[in-house]
């Protein structure tokens, strides 16, 4: 509650520029939490998580701009379309083992990114520029509070899910999948379900990004965004629920402020990740984060 109040004050009391940065931090936090459902709890390393983020925004903007649909109806239909698409992707990606899953997820993500960038109906390399937020969100403070509210609700839902028997099964499969199979658990279904749930939360983050940026753009499908999700979890700690929250905060601030200082900001981020992986292998917030030499 105190953190939510602090975010609300910081995003509404210090001007529009601060609000823009804080809204970006919130969206990246949700994106990182969604990825950690796969990466941290199930041990599934997806290299295509940007696809969920990007498709959420693109489908929403396309429905509003091309079909002239009411924004809230478009949001609902976007979730339905994403659910069907992610289910099909999950069935394909999880057909074999986790090694093939990693590369299949990357392949599908790259295919979607290239297809969207070449498809003029989706704006090509320019993207779709459309104000999807309703008129009552014209005030940046109202838009920020809306984004904050959605992220808080999603965070609570993910936290509740992380404490459920379902996630305990995911952790069991991560540690010893053969034992779960021996006990009669269908691990393929288990992994497909968490794949879809993770994608849905990432799609919500992408939809919020479309609200914030008044459109959907090819950068939201870029493979670099998938690696950012991994960095968030590695830096903060994939075994801690709030690890991706801290990781998302760090990554978002780096990408917002370091480019103003140096053009080599990605190198600094890479060096920081290297130090974390070498000295604190479980991340900054993990209870198992010990100094290793």
Question: How would you label these PLM feature ranges?
Answer:
Residues 1-5, 175, 182-189, 258-293:
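Cytosolic-side transmembrane-helix boundaries in multi-pass membrane proteins
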Residues 11-67, 92-101, 170-182, 186, ...:
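Single transmembrane alpha-helix segments in multi-pass membrane proteins
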Residues 21-22, 26, 51, 72-80, ...:
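Hydrophobic alpha-helical transmembrane segments
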Residues 28, 57-58, 82-83, 106-111, ...:
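Residue-level recognition of pore/gate-forming positions within transmembrane alpha-helices
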Residues 67-110, 246-248:
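Alpha-helical transmembrane segments within multi-pass membrane transporters and channels
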Residues 76, 192-274, 278-279:
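Transmembrane alpha-helical segments in multi-pass inner-membrane proteins
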Residues 108-139, 167, 282-287:
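Extracellular/periplasmic helix-loop junction at the C-terminal end of a transmembrane helix
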Residues 138-217:
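Helix-loop-helix "hairpin" substructures at the membrane interface of multi-pass membrane proteins
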